[in-house]
Amino acid sequence: MENIVMGILAHVDAGKTTLSEGMLYLSGTVRKLGRVDHKDAFLDTYSLERDRGITIFSKQAVFSLGNRRINLLDTPGHVDFSAEMERTLQVLDYAVLVISGADGVQGHTETLWKLLKLYEIPTFIFINKMDQPGTDRESLLTELKERLDEGCIVFGKGKNVESLEEIAMTDEAVLDYFMEHETVRNE
């Protein structure tokens, strides 16, 4: 079984712990979907975290995904606890950078992005809270490309040719494979 260490990072209140709870619930690791606002999130174990509704200490949870064992690290998002978050970076295989669709890219989001690039951690961006009024998918994608990286692409479209071309353009080896096979590898 392959072991993967994956960190969840974001600015405060973007929904890191909520996303982590969802992953644990959908994988069958926890029986009840906890909520930060209900003070019953599985990963917010300290009373101070539950009282304030924020993550203060990085937490670990483990779940299985196919033949992979995922070690999930939920990190603090508040800038005051950045040192706690930064300590986790040296052990990550992958990261998920959570961005609130309602708030867009924040200053701390840019700092996290730069750190992830510095540590050369492959990163997925997860846009949360897109159901809130005033969110605009296209404006947010433009902001991601301008403030983070031009290579940000949407994976929600499925495996159509346009999406595969966008994915292929992010890496020369992937592009070579795409040009030869008209698809990309699943890994």
Residue ranges and their predicted role:
Residues 1-14, 33, 101-187:
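P-loop NTPase catalytic nucleotide-binding module
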Residues 1-99, 105, 143-152:
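P-loop NTPase switch module centered on the Walker A-proximal segment
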